[in-house]
C-alpha cells in the first residue's frame, strides 16, 4: 500500500542539494586518485552506480551503467548484459527518475551551473527536443555498438566515445592534467568532446538541465518507468486549489496536477515546496484504486 509522507517530502525537497552532493561523493570516493592520475580498479568497479558517472573518473567508486551496457552490447559475449539490464530495470521500478533528481552527479553539475546569476531561458517551446534522448538510447547506445562491429565482432561504445560530456569532465581532463603522457596523446576526438562539454556548460547556464532533458540516454531509460515506479508524486485533490503555482515552479515543464508521473518529472520536489496547501507530496509503494480515481478526477477538474 502506498504511503504519503508530506513532512518527509518537504524535508527531502528542501535538502535535495545536500543529498545530491552526498550522492556525488559516494559515487566518487577515491578523491586522492585525482592527484595520482590513476583509476580505482577494485571490486567496486564491477558494480554499476545509478547515475551518469564516468568509469574513467579517477575517483569513481563504480562503473557507469551506460558505459557498462555498451561494453557488453559491443562484444560477442552477452552474459554480463543481463545483469546490467536487470539492474537498470530494478532501479527504474524502484525509483524512476528520482535518480535523475537526487542521485546523478552530472545532473547536479548542470544545476550548479544554472545557479549562476545570468539571464535564464525557458525550454517550454523546445519540448520536441525531449524525444532526442530516446533516439540516443536506441541508436547510439544500443544499435550502433551492436551492429557496427569490426572484423573480430567488437563494436565501439559510441555514446561514451563520441558524445558523453561527463567522460571529458570527469575522465579526460583530470587524467590529462595529472599525466603528461595522456596529455601528449590528446587529439581531435578530445577536441570534439571538449567542444560538446563546453556547449553543455553554456546551455546549462541558460537552460535548466539541458543534457538531462534532451540527450541523456540514462534519463531516457528511467523515464520509461516513471509511471510505474514505486516512487511517485501524489496530488491530494481535496487540498488542491488549482492555483497553478506547482506548474510555474517546475523547471522540467511538467504540470504535476495533470500528469503527476510524467516522463520528464525528476522528482525534484519544487512543486511540493511551491504548493500553498501541501497538496503535493512524494508517495512510495503501490497506489490504491481510490488514489488513481482521485487523480483522474483531479485531471478532469483542471480541464473544466
Task: Go through each PLM region and give its residues.
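Non-ligating segments of multi-cofactor redox enzymes
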Residues: 1-257, 263-304
Amino acid at each position: 500500500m502506498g504511503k504519503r509522507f508530506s513532512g518527509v517530502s518537504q524535508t527531502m525537497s528542501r535538502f535535495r542539494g545536500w543529498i545530491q552532493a552526498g550522492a556525488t561523493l559516494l559515487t566518487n570516493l577515491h578523491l586522492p586518485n585525482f592527484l595520482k592520475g590513476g583509476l580505482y580498479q577494485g571490486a567496486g568497479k564491477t558494480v554499476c552506480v545509478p547515475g551518469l558517472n564516468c568509469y574513467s573518473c579517477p575517483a569513481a567508486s563504480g562503473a557507469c551503467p551506460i558505459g557498462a551496457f555498451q561494453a557488453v552490447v559491443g562484444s560477442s559475449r552477452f552474459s554480463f548484459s543481463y545483469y546490467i539490464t536487470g539492474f537498470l530495470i530494478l532501479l527504474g521500478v524502484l525509483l524512476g527518475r528520482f535518480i535523475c533528481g537526487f542521485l546523478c552527479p552530472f545532473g547536479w553539475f548542470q544545476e550548479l551551473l544554472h545557479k549562476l546569476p545570468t539571464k535564464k531561458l525557458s525550454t517550454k517551446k523546445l519540448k520536441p527536443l525531449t524525444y532526442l534522448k530516446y533516439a540516443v538510447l536506441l541508436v547510439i547506445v544500443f544499435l550502433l555498438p551492436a551492429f557496427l562491429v569490426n572484423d573480430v565482432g567488437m563494436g565501439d561504445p559510441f555514446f561514451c566515445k563520441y558524445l558523453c560530456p561527463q567522460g571529458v569532465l570527469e575522465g579526460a581532463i583530470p587524467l590529462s592534467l595529472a599525466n603528461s603522457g595522456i596529455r601528449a596523446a590528446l587529439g581531435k576526438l578530445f577536441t570534439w568532446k571538449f567542444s560538446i562539454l563546453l556547449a553543455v556548460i553554456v546551455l546549462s547556464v541558460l537552460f535548466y538541465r539541458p543534457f538531462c532533458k534532451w540527450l541523456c540516454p540514462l534519463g531516457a531509460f528511467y523515464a520509461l518507468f516513471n509511471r510505474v515506479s514505486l516512487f511517485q508524486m501524489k496530488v491530494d485533490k481535496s487540498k488542491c486549489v488549482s492555483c497553478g503555482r506547482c506548474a510555474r515552479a517546475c523547471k522540467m515543464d511538467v504540470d504535476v496536477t495533470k500528469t503527476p508521473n510524467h516522463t520528464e518529472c525528476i522528482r525534484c520536489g519544487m512543486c511540493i515546496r511551491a504548493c500553498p496547501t501541501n497538496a503535493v507530496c512524494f508517495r512510495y509503494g503501490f497506489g490504491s484504486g481510490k488514489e488513481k480515481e482521485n487523480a483522474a478526477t483531479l485531471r478532469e477538474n483542471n480541464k473544466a
